[in-house]
């Protein structure tokens, strides 16, 4: 965290003594922080957060820049893809496909192309960890789901939204989409998209509106290892330390993005109105023998 504190001082144009006065600590304390001999406690980091907010210090951007720099320093052999994984309590032991079954693509080990997305999922947890990982795709059976209604329906299946049409060919199509596959690749339901897709499932927007938002948001991709073979192809390259201060800023951005999702959903409703089908209409059509 010593680098971040130096960057904060630089943005605020403060000396160590001046920062110490603002934080109500000693010069020696700030000096120890910047020389990595001590870490600010939560109270000090909360005060740092307030000072950074007042001084418009771009801590969120500084954090992403740190992560990007670390990622760029990693050299990978051919066939491996660099990704990010956020964990609420850290990865211990063997990597396994053991997330909640109700996640977007079911039970698996989730990785993504966007560091910011991985962080927003874990920023509320004190013991959370961010990892830069890689996965070797060479010998894996992979299915990539397009960023359209196919993606939404696969998510609907895994979130238990299709149970009323269980037994239909439509249901079985999505149940079996990743059958015998080691890895599923598809769009990430980020903070903004999460709200939009929920509005689709509860019947506030149509499939046309959903697909329109998928296109407009240009989402990153998630790679999900759904078998042990897939998980065995994953390697943790490094762990990125995230301070309480950084997580406070990440939490703020996540909340802002959720608010943008609410606004986006409203705009989509206005733009598409009755174009397309609502989720329940799609299920009713499937139950009655339609595709």
Q: Which ranges hold each PLM region?
A:
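Short basic helix-loop element that most often maps to the first helix and adjoining turn
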Residues: 4-19
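Recognition helix of helix-turn-helix/homeodomain-like DNA-binding domains
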Residues: 24-40
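ADP-ribose/NAD+-binding catalytic cleft of ART/PARP-like enzymes
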Residues: 49, 58-104, 123, 276-291
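ADP-ribosyltransferase catalytic core
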Residues: 66-67, 80, 97-107, 113-175
